[in-house]
């Protein structure tokens, strides 16, 4: 199992997906514990465990994770949950440089809505054109099938009940901060046409390096996980008011969560150009 750092945020509840993917509670700890999933408190997000989990201790601040390359290095994958805005003042130049160095060394970063700030403010090349327009509301988006893994995502979503028709995804509360990807570096996976927007894109790192020199990866999402996970019992929430996992009230995977599950497996896999067909792992 990869070692994963997850930062919470007050505008989504990415941490609730961990439970739905079947990760045992014993695997969720603070960094000094033995768990493979370590939580960090982002802006207005959940910041402590419930009394029956890790003795109710507080999460370290997200700045303790992204503040330096040394604190990022222990992790194979960093998951950044939406904070509701970019909040660059809570990150800073040292953090932007550290995250870029982390991905260049082979680290994987999943950047949820508003975490495009890492790619806009850090020493990355321009991988997308951004916008500050209003959210899109509910949308039927296109799953891009012009590359092998996009086609696989489309087929998989139909198989697991995430899509009714191949090549389409119904999105609840679609966001609109990405207009289009820069094809020199990035591949779009899910997009809207009216208005034009990208809901998922990926890029291998170091960006611009030859493929055989790229071992890291970033995924940028404009989807909220909790926005698609609503039941009669409410919506999953992340807030200092909810000790984890009390803010996680839904069960089962929404279509948006199923997409994220696919993307998490992809971002954790061996890095290959998105234009190539993934090969089965070598069994020794």
Question: Which residues are covered by each model-predicted region?
Answer:
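A glycine-rich, often tryptophan-bearing local segment used as a flexible ligand/cofactor-contacting loop or short
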Residues: 84-183, 193
